[in-house]
């Protein structure tokens, strides 16, 4: 009785305490972010927190379950306009880490990492993220998993400080249920203490000094609850004793009934002597004497019950079920179900075979353990599902796919193919082909210079345009017979389909009129009608009634610019279009000079005349010519002002060039330093998935820059902006723009930008592509298709402006330039490599300096000259190979005549231009063909440069 009173008194005290706690008003706000209505108001919630100086603490609470090794974003806040991040929390299961990214006050993203988190394991976890210091004090982020602190990062930049959010400018994205991934709770708590917020997840934590009192109350409450549990346990024992006593009374009453003494039997006031000394009869067996199924035996001392049935334990009167599952009769990992009586084991787990078992009793459970035998999935006739010719490795209850079998190369994604090698005896290439081994283990065969085909079969290629003189027995395009054996035409154009290429067909259109007299060389027109009296007949004139000898057609709609009222095809008439030759529907013009931003050479400075005297695509009004790193981009527009990066590649478009950006793709994994290196530095993949463990992430396997062109044929595998060689878009640069007999070059581009023809005996000029390069390999076939002239032709690289570029030029014979002003210039026969750095720019000084073989002060330096002094031959094809590595100044040029190497500059080092654009060059020479042009990004330093340096240091 005293104990019961104590229990009641304790319960009263506990209720009073809880009442007092409940009466306290919380000083925080809780928002359920999984509620649709709350999601719609998330912008106002955030703005309230950011603008309220007293709101210094923010908590995010989440309960979730993630499948093993998964990488998911649990929750994030994003801009509705451009989908940029404001706040994002991502779990990277494969790396056992999590990342928190948020917008700093300077508008840039800051990344925080929490390591050693094993929370992507198929189990439910509770997360509490505490951000402190929104407005004052030190800013830190602390993470709790399942009520336990798992990481803290201190001295952080303030998140979202000073940022104004408009209504509807932010939207919330949360983890969506997919497979085993699910989220049951996501709450935002503004304000409050750690212990108060932790209690929402039933976590009892103390914060620090300010929350010490609350922590003490929580500990007192826990102690009182523990004491109450002990008293309830004692009460349970008392009740069990009362049950036993009740059972004893029941048996006593049963004995009284067996003596025939009912409840109404009158008891005498005085017990007779005979009756008082009579021993009452012992209880006899009846239907309720023993537990069901237990045998009851009458004895002199009363009834006696036999043993409890199998699967039960007790005295025969009371029998309770035995829990056989305590003996672990089931196979490891199989669920045991206790029944009354007996037990049952469920089916064997996946990857095992065996039967289910069920039985009754301790002995059965001890003697009959469930047996599950491992299934060898690798012997199912399908190699376990692994790719053919790869290793299938059986494991207990499962299997895994390994690498390729010996003699095969590849992986589980691309398959395992028979190993190819360039080693002797395994080289599959033609005897006149070069063999190279790729990263994926495959082999590439390329026909050598002067040969053409698919690499496995090669035939003689006299004009070195990539097509053999005779057809080869292979289906590839480059196995077909060259339709112009002695004139390079890498596009194999044949207008009249007579199997004679246009380049060598005297009547290319087959209209019976020779090309020299035909006013439509590539369009049959026997009548030669020419309404506007320009040099093009009506059949091929894109402006039949308007004289336009240039036939320029910006939008390629078949209507020449001269008669097209919308030259760029953007739907805006020329008279109203602020960029007449560049499509710009928006017509943006931020400097208001009447020239649209997209075609404005100074988009931030008024310059309506668009003057660009040095032809560097930067208007004179904003051209500073201050270039600290020498890569051709002035410091004010260079995305890496002090690091050489002529290509200006900026993969993540953050305004920082890849060359000086430590995280090119902005996925939170640094390119080189820990926790990197990033196995896909140009494609976001925070999880770093790499199923075949080859060091290249799955997302960029075989296409490193994700430009949809596989690396094997991609001319720039690490630059998504350059995929194929293409000079269809080019800039013309006239190097002697003034004079009485001015003749500018006439450029024709063929074969989808891989062939250029110049037809005029012209003043010096360039055709320059718009693509800029860092390191580059540049090759092509050079051919002068005439016998009537003997002047200069060549190519350029490292072009930065009309005063700064490298040129490789070839003169046929010795000759003094016909104009001796401003100085006498003498050209010698042979190949010359020059660095042009002209103070005067295009004009007579640069013209004569280019003609002259040698150095010219303030104009040109001669870096190398072919000592043979041999000029080019009429109607003979030559193949050149150029290597330029501007980061170290490495230059090397080689020339082939047929299959023979005829000139080699060797290693030449010059750092005048640190990268730039590519193009071709002519000076007073007509009918030049640059065919089968190819460029490829390449920053790898050649081996001969190391030997060159060693030789230089030793001398």
Swiss-Prot record:
Region forming the signal peptide: 1-24
Disulfide links within the chain: 285-296, 290-305, 308-319, 325-336, 330-345, 348-372, 378-392, 386-401, 404-416, 422-435, 429-445, 447-458, 474-479, 484-504, 520-540, 543-563, 579-599, 602-622, 640-660, 680-700, 716-937
Chain ranges of the EGF-like domain: 281-320, 321-358, 374-415, 418-459
One example of a Gene Ontology biological process annotation: positive regulation of cell division
This protein's UniProt keywords: Calcium, Cell adhesion, Disulfide bond, EGF-like domain, Endoplasmic reticulum, Extracellular matrix, Glycoprotein, Growth factor, Mitogen, Repeat, Sarcoplasmic reticulum, Secreted, Signal, Unfolded protein response
Listed CDD domains: EGF_CA, TSP-4cc
Major subcellular site: endoplasmic reticulum
GO CC, alphabetical: collagen-containing extracellular matrix; endoplasmic reticulum; extracellular space; sarcoplasmic reticulum
Annotated localization: Endoplasmic reticulum; Sarcoplasmic reticulum; Secreted; Secreted, Extracellular space
Residue ranges, compositional bias (Acidic residues): 657-668
Gene Ontology molecular-function annotations: calcium ion binding; growth factor activity
Domain of life where this protein originates: Eukaryota
Polar residues compositional bias, start-end: 637-649
InterPro entries hit by this protein: ConA-like_dom_sf, EGF-like_Ca-bd_dom, EGF-like_dom, EGF_Ca-bd_CS, Growth_fac_rcpt_cys_sf, NOTCH1_EGF-like, Thrombospondin_3-like_rpt, Thrombospondin_3_rpt
Disulfide bond listed as a keyword: yes
Residues linked to a glycan: 609, 938
Region (Disordered): 610-678
Boundaries of every TSP C-terminal domain copy: 728-942
Keyword Nucleus belongs to the record: no
TSP type-3 repeat segments: 460-492, 493-528, 529-551, 552-587, 588-610, 611-648, 649-688, 689-724
Ranges for domain Laminin G-like: 25-192
Record family assignment: Belongs to the thrombospondin family.
Oligomeric form and interacting partners: Homotrimer; disulfide-linked.
Function: Adhesive glycoprotein that mediates cell-to-cell and cell-to-matrix interactions and may be involved in various processes including cellular proliferation, migration, adhesion and attachment. May play a role in ER stress response. May participate in the genesis and function of cardiac and skeletal muscle.
Stated name of the protein: Thrombospondin-4
